[in-house]
Swiss-Prot record:
Residues that, per the record, bind ATP: 361-368
Keywords attached to this entry: ATP-binding, Cytoplasm, Hydrolase, Nucleotide-binding, Protease, Serine protease, Stress response
Cellular component, GO annotation: cytoplasm
UniProt name for this protein: Lon protease
This protein's record includes keyword Cytoplasm: yes
Length: 810
């Protein structure tokens, strides 16, 4: 011990470089590697290596501090020697140090590059030799027990501990191997008395051994529990093997027998029966509590809950069918006639095979309720599958059984809900199908909607063919924007909007009665006159269907309930008339009557088709000084912009016939605007209206306020046919217009237009632009004669001569 002390004999108050340590306390006689990364600590090590100095290894109080102050460093550390130093590529330094003797810092030196401190070596107080001997033996014995419980310490450490004779070194070496917190290790380092240090080490080990023994008991208990579980599993497997030899248990036998009985009673196809029996056989060989058994049981439940060849009796009374359709829906005569034709053919052929009916029309015209009426009139069970926003193919075809929580697709789920194999299956909003990386559900529907293929529809979950050939499929859509192969499998039945008379009749027959009941009104408490009903339709709704109208009637009913309750008198009732309609319905939302109040130059009323029915389209044109440019505004699409260009070119080509001087185009700009500016517009059918506005603004002849028009134009002045004629004519009638110009080629479509619409409008077929202008302008255009001005040849100066030669003058 004296020799060890003489090695570190340095004058008291010597100056040492100090690298603050984090998460480690270095004890005397301890060799430990350190990784130094902070700049101050690296510079301290460089200073040590210059003169082969000693280093003071002191721990900082808070390891989280990157830039500690002297106050953040413990005052007692260990003077050590640097045995090895290695600079790493990332700038950090790996250093191997050996602890020497305890030292107490007296004062930190002023050094900005790194910490330096004056420190005095701490002399150990040895104490009585016999007591130290006893404490040493007790510590070694306790350490042996500690090593047995703490597997992290290698057994070789015990050999080196047994060879230590010095009590102080023994205490420090054992302390360095204990799993203690930094403050506890620092207490041991600061303890100068050897006997006290040994006692503290012994006490720390005593506490740690107690904790380790509890940990060991917990580990043993968990191990025993696991062994017990494994043993139970092994015995269960043996029990299953014995049960397989002797026969199933009562519960298992009852479940299997019940499933087998259901399978035998169900009218499966041969493939489905074989599959169900194979799954039942698999279920019998499984543990009832296993996860796989639950999957098989769910599969069999689905197989047994789907209707297999379980038909309901289809009604063939077509008179009853017509009566039901007429009772549920007013108007829609062409649609109902087409449905009845389809039903007649099905009854005659006694099978469903044929085109899939698809009802296409704006919202609120009764497409979904028509599907319900068809089911009611044929006696089929009704099931509806909403396809709006469906993006995953598995929604239609189902998920494979390998996935957790898998189940059949919506088609098979719908068949389970229908409880018969020949329901009416309504595929609602089929045009709203989406597609993404999970697949295209519209492609999955191709098999469902093909009469030649749907007899063997294969759901991914069932994995067997299911016959959908007896199902009557009806689709609904707002537009025909759907994949062509899907569209090819359908027969489109157009459901156009309702006329004003039809809306009045629908309100009287269905909507008023429904809302009176829904709002708790009694019979005789609420009444609305026909004139008030017409005003409600004209000034408060602007739609093809009747949804907004129903909301307005519901609003009137609520106001009536409030008024009756406020009066509080028995027999109070509310009558809505044209005079008091504003009181209950509020301010008028729409204008009804002519699109324009007077004949205006450059303002033409066009007709547009939208998903919610027809709309009036006001097309405005103005002429202003410029260089012959044409500007378009109103959020027009490419096709509509091209219509403006075609109209401009045609007007330029026939300028004199329209009474327009050709030179006018070089001096004037034309601005065409289609309000409302925020609404996107596209399509070629506004071509005739564009030409009319441009001719009107260049000639100064006003356009008739009571004329609306629709049609595509060509550069030769022909008017081409358009689509959505019924919706456009209904919009003109709603707008109070008297005359409508339509393409001559659309004259054949007038057969499908209701008589009251044809009576309310003067429909004028036109085939050329001249016909359009003749009816649209307040007076006819007057042609003018125009001669192109003769081109003036540039004068060429004669060359001047000077004497006999020619001279060029510059």
């Amino acid at each position: 011990m004296k020799e060890a002390q003489s090695m570190f004999e340095i004058p008291r108050g010597a100056l040492y470089p100090v690298p603050p340590l984090r998460d480690i306390v270095v004890f005397p006689h301890m060799i430990v590697p350190l990784f130094v990364g902070r700049e101050k600590s690296v510079r301290a090590l460089e200073d040590v290596m210059k003169d082969d100095k000693q280093i003071l290894l002191v721990t900082q109080k808070n390891a989280a501090q990157d830039d500690p102050t002297p106050a953040d460093i413990y005052s007692v550390g260990t003077v050590g020697t640097v045995l090895q130093l290695l600079k790493l590529p990332d700038g950090t330094v790996k250093v191997l140090v050996e602890g020497g003797q305890r030292a107490s810092i007296t004062k930190f030196a002023e050094n900005e590059d790194f910490f330096q401190a004056h420190a005095d070596l701490v002399e150990e107080k040895v104490g009585e030799s016999q007591e130290l001997e006893a404490l040493g033996r007790a510590v070694v014995s306790q350490f042996e027990q500690y090593i047995k419980l703490n597997k992290k310490i290698p057994p070789e450490v015990l050999v080196s501990i047994n060879q230590i004779e010095e009590p102080g070194k023994l205490a420090d070496t054992v302390a360095s191997h204990l799993a203690l917190k930094i403050p506890e290790k620092q207490q041991l380092l600061e303890c100068a008395t050897v006997s006290e240090r040994l006692e503290r080490v012994y006490a720390f080990m005593e506490g740690e051994i107690g904790v380790l023994q509890v940990e060991k008991r917990i580990r043993n208990r968990v191990k025993r529990q696991m062994e017990k579980t494994q043993r139970e599993y092994y015995l269960n497997e043996q029990l299953k093997a014995i049960q397989k030899e002797l026969g199933e248990t009562e519960d298992g036998r009852d479940e299997s027998a019940e499933l087998e009985e259901k399978i035998n009673k169900t009218r499966f196809s041969k493939e489905a029966r074989d599959k169900a029996l194979a799954e039942l056989k698999k279920l019998r060989s499984m543990s009832p509590m296993s996860a796989e058994a639950t999957v098989v049981r769910n599969y069999l439940d689905w197989m047994l809950s789907i209707p297999w060849k379980k038909r309901t009796k289809v009604k063939k009374d077509l008179k009853l069918a017509q009566k039901i359709l007429d009772a549920d829906h007013y108007g829609l005569e062409k649609v109902k006639e087409r449905i009845l034709e389809y039903l007649r053919v099905q009854n005659r052929m006694n099978k469903v095979k044929g085109p899939i009916q698809s009802l296409v029309g704006p919202p609120g015209v009764g497409k979904t309720s028509l599907g319900k009426s068809i089911a009611k009139s044929t006696g089929r069970n009704f099931v509806r599958m909403s396809l709006g926003g469906v993006r995953d193919e598995a929604e239609v075809r189902g998920h494979r059984r390998t996935y957790i929580g898998s189940m059949p697709g919506k088609v098979i789920q719908g068949m389970k809900k229908a409880k018969s194999s020949n329901p009416l299956f309504l595929l609602d909003e089929i045009d709203k199908l989406g597609a993404d990386w999970r697949g295209d559900p519209s492609s999955a529907l191709l098999e469902v909607l093909d009469p030649e293929q749907n007899g063997t529809f294969n759901d991914h979950y069932l994995e067997v063919d299911y016959d959908l050939s007896d199902v009557m499929f009806v689709c609904t859509a707002n537009t025909m924007r759907m994949p062509q192969p899907l569209l090819d499998r359908m027969e489109i039945i157009r459901v156009a909007g309702y006329t004003e008379d039809e809306k009045v009749e629908i309100s009287k027959r269905h909507l008023i009665e429904k809302q009176v009941e829904a709002n708790g009104l009694k019979k005789g408490e609420f009444a609305i006159s026909d004139d008030a009903l017409r005003d409600l339709i004209r000034y408060y709704t602007r739609e093809a269907g009747v949804r907004s109208l129903e909301r307005e009637i519901a609003n009137l009913c609520r106001k009536a309930v409030k008024e009756i309750l406020m009066k509080g008198s028995a027999g109070a009732k509310v009558s809505v008339t044209r005079r008091n309609l504003d009181k209950y319905a509020g301010v008028r939302r729409f204008h009804f009557g002519e699109a324009e109040l007077e004949d205006l130059v450059g303002v033409t009323t066009g007709l547009a088709w939208t998903e919610v029915g027809g709309e009036l389209l006001s097309i405005e044109a103005v002429s202003l000084p410029g260089k012959g440019r044409v500007t378009t505004t109103g959020k027009l699409g490419d096709v509509m912009k091209e219509s403006v260009q075609a109209a401009e070119s045609y007007v330029k080509s026939r300028a004199t016939a329209f009474g327009i001087k050709p030179t006018l185009f070089e001096k004037r700009d034309i601005h065409v605007h289609v309000p409302e500016g925020a609404t996107p517009k596209d399509g070629p059918s506004a071509g005739v209206a564009m030409i009319t506005s441009i001719v009107s603004v260049l000639t100064g002849i006003a356009v008739r306020k009571d004329v609306a028009m629709t049609g595509e134009i060509t550069l030769r002045g022909r008017v081409l046919p358009i689509g959505g004629l019924k919706e456009k004519l209904l919009a003109a009638l709603r707008g109070g217009l008297k005359h409508v110009l339509i393409p001559k080629d659309n004259e054949k479509d007038l057969a499908e237009i209701p008589d009251n619409v044809k009576r309310g409008l003067e429909i004028i077929p036109v085939s050329t632009v001249d016909d359009v202008l003749k009816h649209a302008l307040v007076r006819e255009v007057e042609p003018i004669e125009w001669k192109e001005p003769e081109a003036v040849e540039p004068a060429v100066a004669k060359p001047q001569t000077d004497g006999g030669g020619e001279v060029l003058r510059h």
